């Protein structure tokens, strides 16, 4: 440690270019501009959003399935009750699945619709197959982790007694983020600013 700082040079556009990650690498290595693929991974299959069985109210529901390697794919096929898809030579290796994406993904899409989101998540997590819920906002703020982390803050606002807003994700040990005051009304602090900061007397204000 030198005890000396240094200047950090970072542009917003640079971060966007860096976030291209595998897509950027694909282009730089091959010289080919990748086409649109929605939320599907260009280099890994299956790695995308799938519709699952509807919610109790009949609305559509989804999860993301992120099978990162051949071992995880075999485990997924076991969980899905389709071990034959793990043994099918068209789908054994990831490079095969990428090549045959057009036939495999529709098969998986139908399989995924046979079970609910909670059922899939529990089974896949138990098998250590990467996956994740796609939640609406009601589900986000009902999530036990979101609640335990205090991601909803309550404000006493003149126009709404209990105003709930999204809290700061920063949890600072020594100087925690304060939420003592709600966003001010238009002109709420005009007199205070003119009087205390600019020295205007009541008559001038």
Label the model's feature ranges.
Residues 1-67, 74:
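Active-site-adjacent "lid/gating" segments in soluble enzymes
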Residues 7, 41, 45, 67-71, ...:
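Conserved active-site and cofactor/substrate-binding residues in soluble primary-metabolism enzymes
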Residues 26-34, 143-157:
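Short, surface-exposed loop/helix-turn segments at secondary-structure junctions
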Residues 46-127, 131:
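Aromatic-enriched alpha-helical interface/lid elements that frame and gate functional surfaces
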Residues 72-73, 120, 136, 142, ...:
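Residues within well-ordered alpha-helices
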Residues 125-146:
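Conserved PLP cofactor-binding pocket of PLP-dependent enzymes
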Residues 156-204:
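Flexible, small-/acidic-enriched active-site or ligand-binding loops
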């Amino acid at each position: 440690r030198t005890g000396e700082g240094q200047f950090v040079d970072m542009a917003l556009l640079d971060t966007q270019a860096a976030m291209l990650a595998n897509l950027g690498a694909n282009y730089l290595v091959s010289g080919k501009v990748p086409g649109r693929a929605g939320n599907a991974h260009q280099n890994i299959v299956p790695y995308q959003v799938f519709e699952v069985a509807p919610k109790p109210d009949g609305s559509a529901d989804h999860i993301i399935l992120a099978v990162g390697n051949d071992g995880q794919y075999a485990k997924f096929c076991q969980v899905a009750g389709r071990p034959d898809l793990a043994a099918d030579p068209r789908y054994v290796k990831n490079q095969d699945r990428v090549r045959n994406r057009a036939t495999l993904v529709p098969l998986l899409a139908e399989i995924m619709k046979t079970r609910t989101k909670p059922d899939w998540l529990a089974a896949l997590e138990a098998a250590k197959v990467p996956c994740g819920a796609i939640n609406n906002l009601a589900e986000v703020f009902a999530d036990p982790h979101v609640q335990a982390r205090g991601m909803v803050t309550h404000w006493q606002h003149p126009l709404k007694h209990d105003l709930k807003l999204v809290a700061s994700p920063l949890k600072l040990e020594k100087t925690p983020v304060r939420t003592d005051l709600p966003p001010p009304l238009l002109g709420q602090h005009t007199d205070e600013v003119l009087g205390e900061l600019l020295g205007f007397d009541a008559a001038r204000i």
